[in-house]
C-alpha cells in the first residue's frame, strides 16, 4: 500500500480536518491511528464485509475500537465504519458519551456518520481521504447534496410528511410525559 502524505520540515503530516478548506498538522500518533483506519478499510473489502472505509476510536492514546464498514456482512445500511466503531466503543466503555475519545476515519464521514460523531460527543475527528475520493469510485453523496441544497433528491422515492392532528399531538406528548424519567447525559 502506497501512502499519500505531505510532510512538513518538522516531521508532521498534513491532512484535511473536519472543516472544509482547513489543514491541520497531524503528529506521529495521529498518523499511526489513521494508518490503522486505512488498514481496516482494506480489511473490510478483502473479507467482503462492505465498502473501503475504516475507523478507529482512541481513548488516552489507546485503541478502544477498530472497525471497518460492515454494511454487506450485517445487511445493514447504517453499519458504516464510524457508526460501527462508535457502537463498539460505547459498549466497551459502558457509556454513550465519548467526549474523552478521538475518532480516526479513513475517509471524510458521510452526514449520518457526522451525526453519530456529534451525538456521541467525540472530541476530535481526523480523517484521511476527502469524500470526493469515494465519489470517484461510485459512492454517492446525494444525502450531503440534498442537505446542502445543491442536488436533487432523485435516488429515492421517499415521501416525507409531517403528521398533523391527533397523530402529531400524541407523538409530541411523549417528550413532555417522559422529561422527568429520561436523562441522556
UniProtKB/Swiss-Prot annotation:
PROSITE patterns per record: CYT_DCMP_DEAMINASES_1, CYT_DCMP_DEAMINASES_2
Annotated InterPro entries: APOBEC/CMP_deaminase_Zn-bd (IPR016192), CMP_dCMP_dom (IPR002125), Cytidine_deaminase-like (IPR016193)
Domain of life: Eukaryota
Pfam families assigned: dCMP_cyt_deam_1
Entry's Gene Ontology cellular component terms: cytoplasm; nucleus
Tissues in which the UniProt entry reports expression: Expressed in roots, leaves, flowers and siliques.
Residue ranges annotated for the CMP/dCMP-type deaminase domain, each copy included: 28-142
Keywords attached to this entry: Cytoplasm, Hydrolase, Metal-binding, Nucleus, Zinc
Binding residue positions for Zn(2+): 80, 110, 113
EC identifiers of the protein: 3.5.4.15
Described purpose of this protein according to its UniProt entry: Catalyzes the hydrolytic deamination of guanosine, producing xanthosine and ammonia. Deaminates exclusively guanosine and 2'-deoxyguanosine but no other aminated purines, pyrimidines, or pterines. Deamination of guanosine by GSDA is the only source of xanthosine production in Arabidopsis.
Similarity remark: Belongs to the cytidine and deoxycytidylate deaminase family.
Protein name: Guanosine deaminase
UniProt organism field: Arabidopsis thaliana (Mouse-ear cress)
Encoding gene per record: GSDA
